[in-house]
């Protein structure tokens, strides 16, 4: 059994503690029932820790390949440590799958760095323990910066979506107002047409009465002329 003062065991204990923190955050997330931005922020925080844990596991794996000779780690202990890393990575993958991280595939695609365990081993093959720690912190810092940029992109996209939604709402309101104005204009036009029809009908009726009156006057005048001719001839 390795001593707790062993650098590898210290690193593993840190990774194990981080894994326990992630499990606790997942339990709180599932119990809270949060939705919307709050749920997204909590999920982002969990993904951030999972990404850091993945880097720590890669570092632990690389340290197993390059163990200082003075530590004299037996083959049995080496296999035990490999199993410990494998089990912890398996549990981490399960949590990542629950957050749709696809076993850290999203981490690589988002940051544009496909740093697989074999790649990490090759990069640290010539480093001492201090160099490996520095390399690990550099990778973690780069991933943190990538997460911050991703969050900025998400917020920018959200603001654009809100602006587009406001513009669509305004356009819809303008169209509704235009429809209302068209309805009012159509109603007024119908009333004007009805009034014109009544006026036309009244004018036709007035013309008929005038014609009858002129006819009566004509007949009376003709009768008067005939009477005068008969009387004086």
UniProtKB/Swiss-Prot annotation:
Predominant localisation class: Golgi
> Where are its TM segments located?
210-230
Q: Which PROSITE patterns match?
A: SYNTAXIN, T_SNARE
**Tissue specificity comment:** Expressed in root, leaf, stem, flower and silique.
UniProt-listed SMART domains: t_SNARE
Among the entry's GO cellular component annotations, what is one?
Answer: Golgi apparatus
Please indicate the ranges of residues that lie on the Cytoplasmic side.
1-209
Q: Which family does it belong to?
A: Belongs to the syntaxin family.
Function description: Vesicle trafficking protein that functions in the secretory pathway.
Q: How does it assemble?
A: Interacts either with VTI11 and SYP21, or with VTI11 and SYP22 in the prevacuolar compartment, or with VTI12 and SYP61 in the trans-Golgi network to form t-SNARE complexes.
Protein name as catalogued: Syntaxin-52
**Lineage of this protein's species?**
Eukaryota, Viridiplantae, Streptophyta, Embryophyta, Tracheophyta
Q: Which gene encodes it?
A: SYP52
């Amino acid at each position: 059994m390795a001593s707790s003062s062993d650098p590898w065991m210290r690193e593993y204990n840190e990774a194990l503690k981080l894994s326990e923190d992630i499990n606790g955050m997942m339990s709180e997330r599932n119990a809270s029932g949060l939705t919307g931005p709050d749920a997204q922020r909590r999920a982002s925080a969990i993904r951030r820790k999972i990404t850091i844990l993945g880097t720590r596991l890669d570092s632990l794996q690389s340290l197993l390949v390059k163990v200082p000779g003075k530590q004299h780690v037996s083959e049995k202990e080496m296999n035990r440590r490999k199993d410990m890393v494998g089990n912890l990575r398996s549990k981490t993958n399960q949590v990542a799958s629950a957050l749709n991280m696809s076993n850290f595939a999203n981490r690589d695609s988002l940051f544009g760095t496909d740093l697989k365990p074999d790649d990490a081993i090759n990069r640290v093959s010539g480093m001492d323990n201090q160099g490996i720690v520095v390399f690990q912190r550099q990778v973690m810092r780069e991933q943190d910066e990538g997460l911050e940029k991703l969050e900025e992109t998400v917020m920018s996209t959200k603001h654009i979506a809100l602006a587009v939604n406001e513009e669509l709402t305004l356009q819809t309101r303008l169209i509704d107002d235009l429809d209302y104005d068209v309805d009012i204009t159509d109603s007024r036009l119908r009333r004007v047409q009805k009034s014109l029809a009544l006026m036309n009908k009244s004018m036709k009726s007035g013309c008929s009465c005038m014609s009858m009156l002129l006819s009566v006057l004509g007949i009376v005048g003709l009768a008067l002329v005939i009477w005068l001719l008969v009387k004086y001839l």
